[in-house]
Amino acid sequence: AFPTWPLMGEGFFPADAFYVPDGGATWRAFFENPGLVQFLHRMLGYLVFAFGLVVWLKGRKSAHPRTKLAFDWLAAGLFVQVVLGIVTVLQSAPLHLGLAHQFGAILLFTLIVRARHRALYPISTSLRDQKA
């Protein structure tokens, strides 16, 4: 719908966001209007990115190195997914980039589950196991 970033065409919000072609109910625009759907997808992406950064900063405070590493991987996956989403938009969503973006979402979900598991069930470490 809008192969531009960060703006959507000329503005932040698409001008015809609530237009439904057959004059149907306005609520259908949330599912049928490509501009509004893309806007909502972008806003969800920004929200996930901001929340992910907060979670990463909190996860970095763990005393367990493997938990920290899991949150680092989460932040890296989040960054790659955002960049991939922006590139997909700028290239007008070719199939290979769209599929890569969807695969990135699955990978990001997996990294979230892994980081959460590491935070809830950290691998205990001992000073005796450390090599000098």
Predicted regions and their residues:
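Polytopic transmembrane helical bundles with strong interfacial aromatic enrichment
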Residues: 1-132
